[in-house]
A protein has these predicted regions:
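Oxyanion-binding "anion nests"
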Residues: 164-182
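Inter-helical turn/loop segments and adjacent helix faces that build the functional surface
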Residues: 27, 86-98, 114-126, 144-160, ...
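Aspartate-rich (DDxxD/NDxxD/DxxxD) Mg2+/diphosphate-binding motifs
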Residues: 5, 12, 28-77, 107-111, ...
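Conserved small/polar residues in nucleotide/adenosyl-binding loops
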Residues: 188-195
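Hydrophobic, amphipathic alpha-helical faces that serve as interaction scaffolds
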Residues: 81-84, 103-104
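Alpha-helical phosphate/pyrophosphate-handling elements in metalloenzyme active cores
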Residues: 2-37, 126-167
Length: 199
């Protein structure tokens, strides 16, 4: 389960948790547990995403499913989700609810991306909501968790949650643009972006 962790990554979620905690008591043991749990959740989601997307590589190394097969990659993601839940459960009901609500949004975002926009959906609104759920929700939880578990003033919680979600949407939007830019021939066909982004 350390394969993708050791491959690198930006660690933006734990960094934002630790930064948000500076509004309160700083990097307490609880804050550090939240930072760990949310990064572990993110790692678990990468194992699953790569299976679903059929990705060949992740963080410069072969994707886990390309090395060990789909079953092991999925089970590795599952064990990481369980370990993240164990960490959050030590922090009480508020942490459990934060993890559960975040995980629900993450899964719904992935599900909606897989299904694609339905007739009657505004494709841009649909796409942005997918980004907010799939990527923004976990970064929002990171900033929100930093506020909650550092005992920062409660008035910071919602603005920091919104801030984290917007960072997540912007990051995923940029990532999608980079993916499209790697295939310049796709950019000049009328429906290429829609097909690539499933909207």
């Amino acid at each position: 389960s350390r394969y993708l962790y050791e491959a690198g990554g930006k660690r933006i979620r734990p960094v934002l948790t630790l930064l948000a905690a500076q509004l309160g008591d700083g990097n307490t043991e609880q804050v550090i547990d939240v930072a760990k749990a949310l990064e572990i959740t993110h790692l678990g989601s990468l194992y699953h995403d790569d299976v679903m997307d059929g990705a060949d590589r992740r963080r410069g190394v072969p994707a886990a499913h390309a090395v060990w097969g789909n079953n092991i990659a999925i089970l590795t993601g599952d064990i990481l989700f369980s370990r993240a839940s164990q960490l959050m459960s030590r922090l009480g009901e508020r942490a459990i609810r934060l993890q559960a609500d975040t995980f629900e949004r993450l899964v719904l975002g992935q599900m909606h991306e897989t299904l694609g926009a339905q007739p009657g959906d505004d494709p841009i609104e649909f796409y942005l909501q997918v980004l907010a759920d799939k990527t923004g929700s976990l970064i929002a939880a990171a900033t929100q968790g930093g506020v909650i578990f550092s005992n920062a003033p409660s008035e910071y919680e919602e603005p920091l949650r919104v801030y984290g979600e917007k960072i997540g949407v912007a990051f995923q939007l940029l990532d999608d643009v980079i993916d499209l830019s790697a295939k310049p021939c796709l950019l000049y066909t009328s429906d290429a972006a829609d097909d690539s982004l499933r909207v």
